[in-house]
């Protein structure tokens, strides 16, 4: 039934596309109706009404009862993922969800951009692709996703570099030599992900995943005895490594509600970040993890146990050798905690690091740490943590608080008990806190942050009160753009580092990858201010300034046999740029520069008062 209005007594001619014509006459009030009898097929058709030389058009959508016919735009039927039918003649073909072409639209703002929604090829990640999880690879719900990544890093920096009698140049026979260093690192990553389930909303039923990484790294320094203990090996090193870094099987154990609440298990080498910012444990390693949610996803939880694999020294990738360190983690997430938009987390971490003796690939002793009394010792520590992430009104708030307690059989800096009362062990008791507050205003995000890790003021009092993490990788206070966070700074002549690469903690560890946690350390205080700027949709700039100081200095003085070291480490100024030329993650170019202005404490330790600089470029190509 078609209706409309026109001039009283006017004759109206109606035409429906591909269905013929009809006529009717308007009544005295100007209203007209027409019962359309010619057949109209399912589809969208144009209706044309003509009266007295005036023409009006309108679209008509027709949906007839019965099966939906296959759309001509997506013929022919793809041979992948077609359901097996025992009697095809008893069925009428219907369009499935993977072959319904979405409306065409452009990925970029350019008019000549390629439209989305077309059948793609094997090497086309933007349109439907069998190898990107867009179509079932077999059956009705088995999908395969291949990801290939090239991660290329070039870096140049100046760092305090120890020298000695075997120096490259006669002018370098002092405590510190030439400080220029260069690094090149290339990772080729191939990830294979086969999973059963749906591509959205519903949790995956089961999954097999493996990730291969081929690494090539080159480092060049200006002094001998650093890339290898043997000074005859020169000042540069080239190394390569291939690692099966990630391999696991995941299985959904049970659906808990109609709202996709579930419980699943994952077994194998798998990535896991135990909190929002990676303050305590952020690693890909061998373990078993049970995880899930309930109450319509308002609550999530993880129960995980890791028996960690040894890391390769120069690439940081996993090997197949167990390192005799076990980690157990339980955490609980509560969304909309007290206020909407804020997620609270509670966690318990336990680490047992066994007494072992281990040299890294470069021939350097890393367990136990070659400082003080370097005797193999066992560490057992428990971390209690509370953290949160979200927004309160217009303010973005991120915080974390941790307390660690436990026992270290023989801390190398504390040494044996001089009173011979309770053995040579030390009691661990230390804390850490972090807070960041930011405010989004249009394309600007100013932020303020504070980070604190307690230090040990009395290294030999049988209580270790310096905070250290299990395996941290924090994205905080400038993250990887910060000089202090990004670059490891060694303590000359001690075999330990003031701070490890990719860490904020002045933990005095021999190595973050291969060494043991070290709870007799100076701790650190960091006050940070920054500004994130979305310059364009393609370009983001990150400005950060950090003021850094020791919490306590006594443990550093004990190692260096040097008194009156000041607490001020220095000021870290950094700029980071992230550029996405295609407005997606397929090509990402990251660059940055940082300047470290030494404070009085840094000058006391390294005899350096001129600024240290760091620049890098990182190109990430993803398929």
Can you describe what each PLM-predicted range is?
Residues 1-66:
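Ser/Thr-rich low-complexity repeats and stalk/linker segments
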Residues 115-146, 157-161, 195-208, 253-263, ...:
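Short loop/turn motifs that connect adjacent beta-strands in outer-membrane beta-barrel proteins
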Residues 164-174, 224-229, 314-320, 355-375, ...:
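Solvent-exposed loop segments that connect transmembrane elements
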Residues 187, 191-312, 433-486, 570, ...:
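Outer membrane beta-barrel
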Residues 259-262, 270-463, 527, 534-539, ...:
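Signature for the C-terminal beta-barrel architecture of outer-membrane proteins
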Residues 552, 582-610, 622-623:
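C-terminal beta-signal and adjacent terminal beta-strands/loops
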């Amino acid at each position: 039934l078609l209706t409309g209005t026109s001039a009283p007594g006017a004759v109206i001619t109606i035409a429906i596309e591909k269905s013929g014509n009809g006529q009717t006459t308007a009544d005295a009030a100007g209203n007209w109706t027409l019962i359309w009898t010619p057949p109209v097929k399912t589809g969208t058709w144009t209706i044309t009404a003509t009266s007295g030389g005036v023409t009006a058009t309108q679209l008509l959508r027709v949906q007839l009862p019965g099966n939906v016919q296959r759309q001509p735009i997506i013929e022919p039927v793809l041979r992948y993922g077609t359901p097996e039918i025992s009697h095809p003649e008893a069925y009428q073909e219907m369009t499935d969800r993977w072959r319904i072409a979405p409306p065409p639209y452009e990925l970029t703002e350019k008019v000549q951009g390629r439209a989305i929604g077309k059948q793609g090829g094997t090497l086309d990640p933007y349109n439907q692709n069998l190898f990107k999880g867009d179509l079932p690879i077999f059956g009705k719900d088995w999908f395969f996703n291949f990801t290939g990544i090239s991660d290329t890093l070039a870096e140049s920096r100046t760092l305090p570099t120890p020298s000695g009698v075997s120096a490259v140049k006669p002018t370098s026979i002092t405590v510190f030599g030439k400080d220029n260093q260069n690094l090149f690192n290339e990772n080729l990553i191939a990830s294979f992900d086969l999973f059963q389930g749906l591509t959205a909303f519903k949790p995956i039923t089961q999954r097999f995943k493996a990730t291969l990484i081929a690494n090539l790294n080159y480092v060049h320094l200006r002094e001998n005895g650093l890339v290898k203990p043997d000074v005859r090996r020169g000042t540069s090193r080239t190394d390569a490594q291939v690692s099966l870094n990630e391999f696991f099987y995941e299985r959904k154990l049970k659906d808990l509600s109609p709202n996709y609440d579930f419980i699943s298990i994952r077994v194998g080498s798998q990535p896991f970040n135990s909190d929002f910012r990676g303050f305590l444990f952020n690693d890909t390693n061998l373990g078993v993890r049970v995880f899930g949610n309930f109450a319509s996803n308002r609550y999530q939880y993880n129960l995980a146990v890791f028996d960690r694999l040894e890391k390769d020294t120069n690439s940081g990738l996993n090997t197949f050798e167990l390192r005799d360190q076990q980690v157990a983690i339980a955490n609980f997430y509560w969304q909309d905690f007290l206020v909407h938009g804020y997620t609270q987390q509670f966690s318990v971490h336990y680490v047992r690091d066994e007494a072992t003796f281990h040299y890294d690939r470069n021939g350097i002793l890393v367990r136990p740490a070659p400082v003080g009394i370097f005797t193999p010792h066992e560490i057992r520590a428990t971390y209690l943590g509370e953290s949160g992430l979200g927004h309160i009104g217009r303010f973005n708030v991120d915080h974390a608080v941790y307390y660690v307690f436990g026992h270290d059989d023989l801390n190398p800096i504390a040494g044996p008990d001089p009173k011979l009362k309770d053995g040579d062990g030390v009691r661990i008791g230390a804390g850490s806190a972090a807070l960041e507050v930011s405010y989004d205003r249009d394309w600007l995000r100013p932020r303020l942050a504070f980070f604190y890790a307690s230090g040990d003021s009395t290294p030999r009092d049988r209580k270790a009160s310096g905070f250290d993490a299990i395996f941290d990788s924090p994205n905080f206070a400038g993250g990887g753009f910060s000089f202090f966070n990004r670059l490891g700074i060694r303590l000359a002549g001690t075999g330990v580092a003031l701070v490890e690469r990719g860490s904020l903690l002045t933990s005095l560890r021999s190595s973050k990858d291969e060494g043991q946690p070290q709870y007799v350390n100076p701790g650190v205080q960091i006050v940070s201010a920054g500004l994130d700027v979305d310059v364009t949709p393609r370009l983001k700039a990150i400005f950060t300034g950090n003021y850094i100081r020791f919490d306590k200095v006594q443990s550093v003085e004990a190692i260096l046999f040097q008194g009156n070291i000041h607490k001020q480490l220095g000021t870290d100024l950094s700029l980071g740029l992230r550029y996405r030329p295609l407005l997606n993650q397929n090509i990402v170019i990251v660059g940055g520069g940082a300047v470290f202005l030494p404070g009085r404490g840094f000058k006391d330790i390294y005899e350096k008062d001129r600024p240290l600089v760091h620049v890098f470029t990182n190109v990430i190509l993803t398929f």
